[in-house]
């Protein structure tokens, strides 16, 4: 892999890692989790409209595009915010999200028929055992619901990466604009029905929270994910996805600096 692609993977890891503590900061500022995920996707959509120009892809891409938009734009972000909302500490959620790697490799094998080597099978088994051990940590008694949502986020993210591989021939701005559209509309409706008082809550969001939400929309959802799409034009899911294991290093380090977590 050339140095340029390795640097891209490093940027993606840093961006994904930073998303967790920054999301927790916004949630601590009394922004409801589902609404926050919706606003993040709304900003993604708003930024991409000039590049998307409301183009509709060929019908053969629509099933995978819809599946990707729902799994990534709706499920990943809502489960991520709910995981952090129901967790008093961030680090276990970050580690639990690592289930996305074995989930992704398994999904790529069953859906895309990618080969799983014996080494990858060992890695998959080790990953599940490692997360299972974390679940039995006595310090996490009050965080099981958060870890449950983190596991759902990991599963959704894994399927999203597989679907994105099927969309590699589409324009990246189109794919991510659809993701923003589905995520914004569906999550906004869910927020209105479940969390309520949506308009007044949006009006009361602080400037600092808007900055953090914008960071996640621009740097993480656009920057990191667009670059991930770029790499999928050259590599398989099995080749790229293991690098996802790097982001906990940055996420846990930031959690320590911001919240003092050990």
Specify the residue positions occupied by each region the protein language model found.
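Glycine-/small-residue-enriched transmembrane alpha-helix faces in small-molecule transporters
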Residues: 1-35, 139-166, 185, 189
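Hydrophobic alpha-helical transmembrane segments of multi-pass integral membrane proteins
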Residues: 4-8, 34-50, 67, 123-126, ...
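Hydrophobic/small/kink-forming positions within alpha-helical transmembrane segments
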Residues: 14-17, 21, 70-74, 78, ...
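Specific transmembrane alpha-helical segments of multi-pass solute transporters/efflux pumps
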Residues: 18-20, 49-97, 133, 217-235
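Membrane-interface helix termini and inter-helical loops of multi-pass transporters
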Residues: 21-30, 82-86, 132-145, 194-213, ...
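Specific alpha-helical transmembrane segments that line the substrate/conduction pathway
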Residues: 35-43, 72, 81-115, 153, ...
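Helix-helix packing/entry segments at the starts of transmembrane helices
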Residues: 39, 77, 92-99, 163-185, ...
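Hydrophobic transmembrane alpha-helices of multi-pass small-molecule transport proteins
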Residues: 48, 107, 119-136, 155, ...
């Amino acid at each position: 892999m050339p140095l340029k692609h390795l640097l891209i993977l490093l940027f993606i890891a840093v961006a994904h890692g930073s998303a967790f503590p920054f999301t927790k900061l916004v949630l601590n500022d009394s922004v409801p989790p589902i609404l926050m995920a919706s606003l993040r996707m709304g900003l993604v959509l708003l930024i991409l409209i000039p590049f998307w120009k409301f183009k509709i892809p060929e019908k053969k891409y629509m099933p995978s595009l819809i599946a990707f938009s729902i799994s990534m734009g709706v499920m990943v972000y809502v489960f991520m915010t709910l995981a952090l909302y129901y967790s008093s500490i961030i680090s276990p959620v970050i580690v639990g999200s690592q289930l996305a790697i074995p989930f992704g490799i398994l999904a790529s094998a069953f859906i895309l028929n990618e080969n799983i080597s014996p080494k990858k099978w060992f890695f998959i088994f080790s990953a599940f055992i490692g997360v299972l051990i974390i679940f039995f940590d006595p310090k996490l008694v009050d965080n099981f619901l958060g870890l449950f949502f983190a596991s759902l986020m990991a599963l959704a993210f894994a399927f999203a990466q597989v679907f994105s591989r099927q969309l590699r021939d589409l324009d990246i701005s189109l794919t991510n604009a659809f993701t923003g559209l589905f995520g914004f509309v569906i999550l906004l409706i869910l927020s209105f029905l479940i969390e309520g008082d949506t308009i007044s809550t949006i009006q009361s969001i602080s400037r600092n929270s808007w900055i953090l939400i914008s960071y996640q929309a621009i740097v993480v959802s656009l920057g990191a994910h667009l670059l991930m799409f770029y790499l999928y034009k050259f590599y398989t899911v099995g080749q790229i996805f293991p690098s996802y294991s790097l982001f906990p290093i940055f996420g846990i380090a930031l959690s320590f600096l911001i919240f003092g977590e050990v």
